[in-house]
From Swiss-Prot:
The modification Phosphothreonine is found at residues 196, 464, 516, 684, 702. Pathway: Protein modification; protein ubiquitination. This is Denticleless protein homolog. It comes from Homo sapiens. Ubiquitinated by the anaphase promoting complex/cyclosome (APC/C). Autoubiquitinated through 'Lys-48'-polyubiquitin chains in a PCNA-independent reaction, allowing proteasomal turnover. Polyubiquitinated by SCF(FBXO11) when not phosphorylated, leading to its degradation. A tight regulation of the polyubiquitination by SCF(FBXO11) is involved in the control of different processes such as TGF-beta signaling, cell cycle progression and exit. Phosphorylated at Thr-464 by CDK1/Cyclin-B and CDK2/Cyclin-A but not by CDK2/Cyclin-E, MAPK1 or PLK1. Phosphorylation at Thr-464 inhibits the interaction with FBXO11 and decreases upon cell cycle exit induced by TGF-beta or serum starvation. Changing residue 466 to A: No effect on interaction with FBXO11.
Length: 730
């Protein structure tokens, strides 16, 4: 009692800036505890535990310690919270509704209360006499909130899921045994999504008014600011509206217009609702508990509608989480969906709150005793009611054993922002360094460690980061510079449209060292002709012996790994495939084709498609202009012929001006041998090659030795083509 008298003393003094002189009580918040005697289980009709939905302390004189609790089964219980020593805490209970009671409110200064339930009614009870005074009927859905005016004991308001706000007056005569609303706000929180303007409807009598139903625009909480002002909030529109009750909203059923609105101030993309609204003792500050895990504080007397403070740290995922203020308006307590209750100091909302721990489910309704700072009541979905008291060290049994503690308070620590978290060097992941060597586990091909760094372009490996290195064009295209600057620069990010197979060729153990052309013969090529040898005849003699070994090279993955391990900076690895080697490779393919029957050679394109992977390891992928590059050049083993006149023939892919005469000579020879016209498609690629070089044993090509495409299909007998007369004559 001494503690309460000290707390009440500042309230009698002079206000400072709208606030009374206050004692530093924040250090006492961590002293709240809940003993085993202050934990009560909420039971239903059959004795099964059910969750309590609402709790509130009485405001009647000398009865401020009475706590009313309503649960899901429709029961209302009264608890005596004056002391822990009382054995019988619940001194009265009754079934108020045959449905869940979502909210209840005491009549100011009297032992009477009103309950709002899911049976679409609100009931007026005399607690002292234990009887029902009257039933308020008018809503068409569950009632979610009820509130009394501090200035009128007979006037209260209700809000329901039907989207309507109704004002009731118990002084009016009851009609057919039920109270009727004296004022109604229909569609109080409808969203403005209609494109057409609302049509004015004819005036109706308020007594016979049928309320509208809107299941999507539920009114979750209503509150009286004064005798003429009502505050409400909805479930989805995110707007807090202030209504002037001096206006008769039941006269015309139009879209109601509030006198003031507080728009949703949060950052959520969708508009959210509010689960609780409370006013301080002066009625000038509003605390709105939003479902975006924030509590917004608004100034009701100013013109600004933006919040003056924001409290966070808790979680609010349902419309059952409520809030309450301490008797001196210093502290704000709220339930939370994370099984705890939170207490903030109103003047310092940025400081971490004090947490009341002990519940095992969501904490829904909370109430700070208006006459005792040391007492807080909390309801939870774990079917229990807890009464928290300040621990003064006096709560002991006569035997000396302390009471069992089922709830305690702790100070929440400041949480570091995710963007400000500092990671130490030992925990951080090192950045990927540019890899100059190829990884044998890469799924896509990459250049070897000794491959030229800037000559040609390779496809990027799938797991290799991209790096950009600029080099001079002259150095990138000179064969001498390419071989000399292998280990000096890291690989350039290749582009797929400039890919060349030459840059993938590496040195095998049995290959001969590369022959460096004289400086006089080394030329700087243009970007478009970087892969075309300019002088072929001048380097044929030198490249003839070298090409015998180069033609056997393959780009096998195992070969790349073995060569890559042995490669050093000073190695003489072959980095390109000269044009003479490609010409010799075509000669070998033609020689192998000449040793087989010409009838079997016509199947060459079919066989070459099966070994296309081996063929592409030596020459470039075929272009649509040159069909010879896709021949069966990869058939191994092939006998090597001496470098002679046959090696002078070069392919069309090298674009040499002298290569145009052999095709004309072959066409003239064909016309001389075959006077009858032939289809161009009947000539096989091997026959085209034979006309451009001298063979050891020349083969005369006749129409009988060439197989047409029709010979591969089933040939019908003459009986199928001839009639019966012709068969008998034969």
């Amino acid at each position: 009692m001494l503690f309460n008298s000290v707390l009440r003393q500042p309230q009698l003094g002079v206000l400072r800036n709208g606030w009374s002189s206050q004692y530093p009580l924040q250090s006492l918040l961590t002293g709240y505890q809940c003993s085993g005697n202050d934990e009560h289980t909420s039971y239903g009709e059959t004795g099964v535990p059910v969750p309590p939905f609402g709790c509130t302390f009485s405001s009647a004189p000398n009865m401020e310690h009475v706590l009313a609790v309503a649960n899901e089964e429709g029961f209302v219980r009264l608890y005596n919270t004056e002391s822990q020593s009382f054995r019988k805490k619940c001194f009265k209970e009754w079934m108020a509704h045959w449905n869940a009671v979502f909210d209840l409110a005491w009549v100011p200064g009297e032992l009477k209360l009103v309950t709002a339930a899911g049976d679409q009614t609100a009931k007026f009870w005399d607690v002292k006499a234990g009887e029902l005074i009257g039933t308020c009927k008018g809503h068409q859905c569950s009632l979610k909130s009820v509130a009394f005016s501090k200035f009128e004991k007979a006037v209260f308001c209700t809000g329901g899921r039907d989207g309507n706000i109704m004002v009731w007056d118990t002084r009016c005569n009851k009609k057919d045994g039920f109270y009727r609303q004296v004022n109604q706000i229909s569609g109080a929180h409808n969203t403005s999504d209609k494109q057409t303007p609302s049509k004015p409807k004819k005036k109706q009598n308020s007594k016979g008014l049928a309320p509208s139903v809107d299941f999507q625009q539920s009114v979750t909480v209503v509150l009286f600011q004064d005798e003429n002002t009502l505050v409400s909030a909805g479930a989805v529109d995110g707007i807090i509206k202030v209504w002037d009750l001096r206006k008769n909203y039941t006269a015309y059923r139009q879209e109601p217009i509030a006198s003031k609105s507080f728009l949703y101030p949060g950052s959520s993309t969708r508009k959210l609702g509010y689960s609780s609204l409370i006013l301080d003792s002066t009625g000038s500050t509003l605390f709105a508990n939003c479902t975006d895990d924030n509590i917004y504080m608004f100034n009701m007397t100013g013109l600004k509608t933006s919040p003056v403070a924001i409290f966070n740290g808790h979680q609010n995922s349902t419309f059952y989480v409520k809030s309450s203020l301490s008797p001196d308006d210093q502290f704000l307590v709220s339930g939370s969906s994370d099984e705890a209750a939170y207490i903030w100091k109103v003047s310092t909302p940025w400081q971490p709150p004090t947490v009341l721990l002990g519940h095992s489910q969501e904490v829904t309704s909370v109430c700070w005793c208006p006459s005792d700072f040391t007492k807080i009541a909390t309801c939870s979905d774990d079917n229990t009611l807890k009464i928290w008291r300040l621990n003064r060290g006096l709560e002991e049994k006569p035997g000396g054993d302390k009471l069992s503690t089922v709830g305690w308070a702790s100070q929440k620590k400041k949480e570091s922002r995710p963007g400000l978290v500092t990671v130490t060097s030992s925990q951080s992941t090192p950045a990927k360094a540019p890899r100059a060597k190829c990884n044998p586990s890469n799924s896509s091909p990459s250049s070897a460690a000794c491959a030229p760094s800037c000559a040609g372009d390779l496809p990027l490996p799938s797991n290799t980061p991209t790096f950009s290195i600029k080099t001079s064009p002259a150095k990138a295209r000179s064969p001498i510079n390419r071989r000399g600057s292998v280990s000096s620069v890291s690989p350039k990010p290749p582009s797929s449209f400039k890919m060349s197979i030459r840059n993938w060729v590496t040195r095998t153990p049995s290959s001969s060292p590369p022959i460096t052309p004289p400086a006089s013969e080394t030329k700087i090529m243009s970007p478009r002709k970087a892969l075309i040898p300019v002088s072929q005849k001048s380097s044929q003699a030198e490249a003839c012996s070298e090409s015998r070994n180069r033609v056997k090279r393959r780009l096998d993955s195992s070969c790349l790994e073995s060569v890559k391990q042995k490669c050093v900076k000073s190695c003489n690895c072959v980095t390109e495939l000269d044009g003479q080697v490609e010409n010799l490779h075509l000669d070998l393919c033609c020689l192998a084709g000449n040793q087989e029957d010409l009838s079997k050679d016509s199947l060459g394109p079919t066989k070459s498609s099966k070994i296309e992977g081996a063929g592409t390891s030596i020459s470039e992928p075929p272009s649509p202009i040159s069909p010879y590059a896709s021949e069966s050049c990869g058939t191994l083993p092939l006998p090597l012929r001496p470098c002679g006149e046959g090696s002078e023939m070069v392919g069309k892919e090298n674009s040499s001006p002298e290569n145009k005469n052999w095709l004309l000579a072959m066409a003239a020879k064909r016309k001389a041998e075959n006077p009858s016209p032939r289809s161009p498609s009947s000539q096989t690629p091997n026959s085209r090659r034979q006309s451009g070089k001298k063979l050891p044993s020349p083969v005369t090509i006749t129409p009988s030795s060439m197989r047409k495409i029709c010979t591969y299909f089933h040939r019908k007998s003459q009986e199928d083509f001839c009639g019966p007369e012709h068969s008998t004559e034969l």
